[in-house]
Amino acid sequence: FGWGKNRAALKAKKAAYEAEVHSYEKSVLEAFKETRNAIVNFNKIKEVYELRANLERSAKSYMDLAQLQYINGVINYLDVLDAQRGYFDAQIGLSNAIRDELIAVVQLYKALGGGWEQNP
């Protein structure tokens, strides 16, 4: 007989098994958390994109209106330049929102486990 060797080995195997189960559960929970965070982030960034797109359209309309008013002598050229600056700022904001949205899509895709290769 093994004087308790077998029993000690069984306890060690059970402890190792429970540690692996705990590690697996922790990994699964972390994956769900990353996925949820990526989805929330994507939705927020999509809202920002929509707001920036609306702002860009409004700034374009304002710039067009300012140009017409200048042509008709209602406003001076500095007002047109100010409207153009606002439009260009809105375009930059929209470009940044598009970039952020694309980055969020990649992060979501990675969180879902897609397209990741360690050694391409």
Language-model features, listed with the residues they occupy:
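Short loop/turn motifs that connect adjacent beta-strands in outer-membrane beta-barrel proteins
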Residues: W3-R7
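Outer-membrane beta-barrel channels and translocator barrels
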Residues: F1-G2, F32
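Amphipathic alpha-helical coiled-coil segments
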Residues: A8-G93, D100-A111
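Terminal intrinsically disordered/low-complexity segments used for targeting and assembly
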Residues: A111-P120
